[in-house]
């Protein structure tokens, strides 16, 4: 059983998608947040999942908060740490502790547009496709090995909000499948590439 801790900062719609997918061999040990008011905490608690908030305002400095979050996550001894709308950059020591065990979903087709404001940046650059990326987390922001990507068209009439809504629908499909592949032992990392045993026979040929 793949014991999983999910980190969120807001409503956690991707977390909800993972929970509702009822993924085989996955047990969600906890949903944690840096925001005590995160709506996703109440939703997870309503599903009978253990929740906790680690509020950075309760700590004198960022290093102390980071240590508290690391210790809280480690206390659950997870096989997988899932970032589902967690809006803080993980410190290097966290990335080292849970190397090859931490997965993030990012709202762009990496390596394009790491960081914030991805949808507006895609529009501003004239992209005809946008999307999302599920990847393993490393200390270098949004640069870890890519597990899966999903794309949507960018329309001339799009705003950042309309594009974000279209991408989010793909996120809700892509992340549960990637988590299921992790839990099934389908994923292996070779340098910057992730090989997926489930899709190994796909060649792209008709």
Where in the sequence are the language-model features?
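N-terminal Rossmann-like dinucleotide-binding module
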Residues: 1-43
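Short, basic/aromatic-enriched C-terminal tail that caps enzymatic domains
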Residues: 16, 189-206
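Donor/substrate-binding cores of folate-linked one-carbon enzymes
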Residues: 21, 34, 84-196
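Conserved beta-strand segments of alpha/beta enzyme cores
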Residues: 27-30, 50-52, 101
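Short, structured coil segments at secondary-structure junctions
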Residues: 47-48, 98
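Short beta->alpha connector loops at strand-helix junctions that form conserved
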Residues: 52-57, 105
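Glycine/small-residue-rich loop that forms an oxyanion/phosphate-binding "nest" at active or ligand-binding sites
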Residues: 53, 60-78, 87
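Structured binding elements
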Residues: 81
